[in-house]
């Protein structure tokens, strides 16, 4: 039934032309289906179509199979002095400059969110640089998502912030593993709470925290303690370590991702 599968995946890819992730995944699996039918022209066509979206998982796989060097640019173009002066001459720019000078990061984050409540591409792009410089990861992602909804093309680095937060007792796993879970679970929002009660950056359930944590402070406290970024990351890291040691997961990151959820 590979022929039928190829047709379904092809139609799936074409019907979702505005969703690059589904377009890439549909194209990739169409190519895989045609590979079973030895239809090399079709394989090449659909792999190339998937490769047009290199910032997606299946786009990267397609690039790798085709031997195409990833065109992803991780550099960020800095604004020139003229653009900077234009921004700082705005009332919102003046307020941000004042907050930076007196060192008030929380108020700075609030101001950036407020000034981007109405879309202005120039202001949003400048705000991104400020958010990245001050490691305001959640704010950075909110602006990125808003700009992308309006069709803006941004350097991919903006979509993957690296916050300053660390687990209370330091990293015992690769930091990138925790960054990935924070990105997916809470978009780096330390105050996030799901309808099921999962809390904070790593979306930890209070019951899981009390079960997994060796920290007496967490075992004795109410759920709001999980809004503390360092403690939340500490519990999340302990939970990931626990899962990785299970025989059913055996250090497999794909299985880990499924088990965490």
Per-range role (PLM):
Residues 2-4, 18-25, 37-49, 60-63, ...:
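Catalytic glycan-binding domains that act on GlcNAc-containing polysaccharides
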Residues 2-10, 66-72, 100-106, 154:
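Helix-turn-helix repeat elements of alpha-solenoid scaffolds
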Residues 90-114:
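Alpha-helical segment of the N-proximal tetratricopeptide repeat
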Residues 18, 54, 83-84, 115:
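Structural signature of alpha-solenoid helical repeat scaffolds
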Residues 13, 26:
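Duplex nucleic acid-engaging cores and interfaces of nucleic-acid transaction enzymes
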């Amino acid at each position: 039934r590979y022929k039928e599968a190829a047709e379904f995946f092809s139609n799936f890819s074409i019907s979702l032309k505005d969703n690059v992730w589904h377009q890439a995944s549909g194209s990739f699996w169409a190519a895989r289906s045609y590979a079973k039918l030895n239809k090399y022209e079709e394989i090449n066509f659909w792999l190339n179509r998937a490769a047009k979206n290199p910032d997606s998982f299946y786009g990267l796989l397609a690039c790798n199979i085709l031997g195409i060097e990833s065109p992803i640019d991780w550099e960020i173009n800095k604004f020139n002095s003229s653009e900077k002066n234009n921004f700082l001459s705005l009332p919102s720019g003046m307020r941000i400059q004042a907050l930076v000078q007196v060192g008030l990061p929380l108020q700075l984050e609030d101001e950036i969110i407020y000034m981007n409540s109405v879309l202005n591409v120039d202001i949003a792009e400048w705000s991104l640089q400020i958010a990245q410089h001050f490691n305001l990861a959640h704010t950075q992602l909110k602006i990125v998502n808003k700009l992308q909804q309006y069709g803006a093309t941004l350097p991919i680095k903006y979509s993957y912030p690296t916050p300053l937060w660390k687990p209370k007792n330091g990293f015992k796993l690769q930091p990138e593993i925790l960054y990935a879970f924070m990105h997916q679970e809470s978009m780096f929002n330390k105050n996030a709470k799901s309808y099921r009660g999962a809390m904070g950056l790593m979306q930890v359930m209070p019951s899981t925290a009390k079960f997994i944590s060796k920290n007496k402070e967490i075992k004795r406290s109410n759920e709001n303690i999980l809004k503390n970024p360092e403690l939340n990351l500490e519990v999340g890291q302990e939970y990931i370590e626990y899962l990785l040691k299970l025989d059913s997961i055996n250090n497999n990151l794909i299985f880990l991702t499924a088990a965490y959820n």
